């Protein structure tokens, strides 16, 4: 009986300490509104009139949407008719400020199954996202949605 009581007391103590062991979510987790999209041109990043949002969940998912207001925008590896939409799982490494998304569905179906590694920097309610490979030549700035 004493062994059961000690075991129950230990389990109760461990259960009450569980929140102390819980990890804080990454600063990347949340809903973000695109404020600037820049593409490399002649060696410099230049703004392109895009709008969009990025949603990263604690459950380990990412969804992204972005739109060029030009209905005649040329397709890119990520867009069709000026629109980008994708969803997938995400693994975040806060110590290196990087993440990898494995695309599970996308408007541009060639993206499905691809792993995309990205760098991010969060400062307050602002986040800058860029490719790991600078030759991809783009950068996106987001602002966290507020209640």
Language-model region placement:
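Positively charged n-region of N-terminal signal peptides that target proteins for export
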Residues: 1-7
